[in-house]
From Swiss-Prot:
This is Ribosome-recycling factor. The lineage of its organism: Bacteria, Pseudomonadati, Pseudomonadota, Gammaproteobacteria, Pseudomonadales. Its main location: cytoplasm. It is found in: Cytoplasm. CDD domains: RRF.
Length: 185
């Protein structure tokens, strides 16, 4: 019973951390990374399709992404989708390859992205704390139903707190790494 609550809390905290990593991947740094274009949707025969399904995206070098479009007739649509996305990127077509140079980040944009990263990290911390609160509430319910003793509840609560501390430390570590990445010129 107690182990199930701890495992559930641990799994949910892990999902929160994965969600944070995914959110951080969308925040653009000065370097080219294929995940930057993950949110771009292309109009493919009238239906919005993720860019990854119509083109192969690779980092050509530190500041350039190269896209190889599977269907040659889609080159203009892919180029338009990248331009209309709110990423501030200007693709250049060279034959069958679309190159997307990454503009250098200004100090102001870096600070804006850092603020965004901190907000994402804070929402991850809040999610982890809410998971802890839910787990502690479940433990209290077990005590009320006399399924576990108060000592067992206290021990389990300490273990849940350790899981929470570990998860929040991982959030802080991920934020620190992202901030360092953003501020590196």
């Amino acid at each position: 019973m107690i182990n199930e609550i701890k495992k559930d809390a641990q799994a949910r905290m892990k999902k929160s951390l994965e969600s944070l990593e995914h959110a951080f991947a969308k925040i653009r740094t000065g370097r080219a990374h294929p995940s930057i274009l993950d949110g771009v949707m292309v109009s493919y025969y009238g239906a919005d399709t993720p860019l990854r399904q119509v083109a192969n995206v690779v980092a050509e070098d530190a500041r350039t992404l190269a896209l190889t479009v599977f269907d040659k007739s889609m080159i203009q649509a892919v180029e338009k989708a990248i331009m209309t996305s709110d990423l501030g990127l200007n693709p250049a077509t060279a034959g069958t390859t679309i190159r997307v140079p990454m503009p250098a980040l200004t100090e102001e944009t870096r600070k804006g992205y850092t603020r965004q990263a901190r907000a994402e990290a804070e929402s991850a911390r809040v999610a982890v704390r809410n998971i802890r609160r839910d787990a502690l509430a479940q433990l209290k319910d077990l005590v009320k139903e006399k399924e576990i003793s108060e000592d067992e509840e206290r021990r389990a609560a300490d273990e849940v707190q350790k899981l929470t501390d570990k998860a929040i430390a991982e959030v802080d570590k991920a934020l620190e790494a992202k901030e360092a990445d953003l501020m590196a010129v």
